[in-house]
C-alpha cells in the first residue's frame, strides 16, 4: 500500500512537466504537409480579406468626407458642434448647477455688501454735514469769543459809519438795531444826494 501511494505521488510532477512540454512544443512538426498547405492558404485568404476591409473602410471614410463637404460640415463646424454639445452637457450636470448657484449667491451677497457700505458712507457724510450746520447755528457758537469779537468789530465799524453819515444814537442798541439803523441812514443819505443833484440841474 505504501509503495502504491508513493508511486502515485511520484507521477503527479511528471504529468505537470508533460503539460508544459506540450504547451511549448512546435506543432509544425506534428502537422502533415497537406495540413500545412491548408493553413497557409487560409492565412493568405485572411490577410487578403483584412486588406480588402481596410480599402473598403478608407473608401467609406472618403465618401463620408465628401458628403460632409457638400452639406457644409467642415472640421471647424464639427468642432463647434462638439464643443456646444459638450458645454450643454456640462451645464446640465448637477455639479455645474450647484457651482453656478453658489457663485450667483456669492455675487448677490457681494453686491448687497457694497450697497450697504455706500449707504453707510452717504449717511455718515450727511450726519457730518448736519452736525456742522447745527454747530454753526447753535447759541453756544454765537456766544463764543470769536463770534463776539467779530460782532464787536462790525458794530464798531457801523457806529463809525453812522457818526460820519448822520450822528450816533446815544441810547446804543443791539447788533441787529445798529444794522437796521445803518441801513436806514444809508437810504436817507442816498435820497438826499439824489434831491440835491436834481436841484443843481434845475439851477443850471
Swiss-Prot record:
Looking at the keywords, is Phosphoprotein present?
yes
A molecular function annotated in GO for this UniProt entry is: identical protein binding
The answer to whether the entry has keyword Coiled coil is yes
- Disordered: annotated segments: 1-20
Positions carrying Phosphoserine are: 29, 86, 122, 131, 149, 174
Please name the GO terms of the biological process aspect recorded for this protein, alphabetically: G2/M transition of mitotic cell cycle; positive regulation of apoptotic signaling pathway; positive regulation of JNK cascade; positive regulation of MAP kinase activity
The chain's coiled-coil residues are 22-73
| Record's signal peptide | none
User: Could you tell me which residues carry Phosphothreonine?
Assistant: 146
User: What are the record's GO terms for cellular component?
Assistant: cytoplasm; perinuclear region of cytoplasm
Task: Output the superkingdom of the source species.
Answer: Eukaryota
Q: Which InterPro entries match?
A: TPD52
Q: What family does the Swiss-Prot or TrEMBL record give for this protein?
A: Belongs to the TPD52 family.
- What is the protein name stated in its UniProt record? Tumor protein D53
Species the sequence originates in: Homo sapiens
